[in-house]
Structure formats: C-alpha cells, structure tokens
Amino acid sequence: MAKSKEDLPYWDKYVDIKENPEHFGIPKEHISRMHQLKEEGFIPTVIYDIGSAVGHWKVAMEQVWPEARTYLFEANEDMAPFYDHYGWEDYHIGLLSDTDGTERNYYYNEQNIGGNSYYKENSAAYSSDIFRVLNTETLDSVVAAKGWPQPQLMKLDVQGAECDILKGSTKVLENVEWLIVELQHINYNDGALLAADSIALIQSLGFELIDEKFASSDVAIDADYLFRRKKDE
C-alpha cells in the first residue's frame, strides 16, 4: 500500500537529493554531456526517466531541455506521494522488466532508495529478508495502456535490471534516438548482467555505443554509457 508523506521518515533526505542532483548520484560530467548533445542539435520533446527515484535526474534535465516533457517510471511505491507533492503527474509506479505478470522479490531500503532492485545489492545496506513481492510489467505494455507519447531520449538506472527492461521495450525503442544506460563492472547486484554482455545486447537492439563510461560516481562499480540509434546504411 502506498504511503503518505507522514509515513516516510526520510522525506527531508529525498527533498535534499532532488534539489541537489549533482551532489547525489548525477556527476557533473553526465550533465555536461547532455548539454553537449543539445549544442549538437538534439532537442527531445519527450524523455523517459526509468528508475526515477526522487526525480533528481528529471530536475537536472529540465535545466538542459526545459521544453521537454519527462515521464517518470519507478518501482518504489513510496515515491507516489513525493511525486504528487511536487505536482508531477506524468509518472508510473510499477516493476518494469522483460515480461508481464511475473512475481519478483523487490529488495528495498527506505533510507538508501537508489539501490532498490529485484537484483539484490551485494552490500550491508540490503537484506535478503526485506523485500516486496511485485508483479513485473514491460515498458511497452505500460506505455500502450497509458497512451503516452514515445520518447526520443531514455535513461535507465535500475541497479542491474536495465537490459531486462530494454528487452521489454522493443516498440518504445523504435523511437529512441539516444539511450543512457548505467552498466555494472562488478557483481554489485546479484545476478545482473555486467557491462560487456549488456553492451552486446543493446547493440543487438539497434544502438551503437558512442561514449563508454562517460560519467560515474565510482567507476570501479558502474558507469553511465551513451548509445545512439544506428543510422540506416
């Protein structure tokens, strides 16, 4: 059951992260690279933020493309009252993956929500005993049901589930020009694909790797990778 503001003990922390994205998980290099895309003429009208957490990436991108409309996708139901508080109507709460209707254990930590995933983080912050059982959805199914517009830019930061979600997004991906994907370099989330295999899969979906590890808070663990839709020969 979704919580209210009064039920969330870390509300003020969520606000702090939202208001200071460069200090909480979005490196300056990431934002600078987006500004570079804009300078090169890329002006998206629709952006999908997959793994939106407190919306801090949305806030950062509004400084780059203020005219774009950003749609939030987040598995953590606790974020619903947070989004409502800020008047963000374009959001979906649900566990995205490559199938519809599959039960998965979603491991979560109220204080460190950035690591929530159905691939449990291999750290002391996450316990095998603390999870919610959620039913998966594909991005294609969600977007079709809601009738939302298709994106030109899509970002995925979902702690190891990136490629699963992409496999369930083949229709949406037909319209995506640029793709930002956080990929892992070590077994940080148990069972998640590592970067090399992830890159191969993303390339098979019609994208080429443009910038490898273009931004990271800790490159030993993971980094952001930038892909562009392959141009027709």
Task: State where each predicted segment sits.
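Phosphate/nucleotide-binding beta-alpha loop and adjacent structural elements of enzyme active sites
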Residues: 1-233
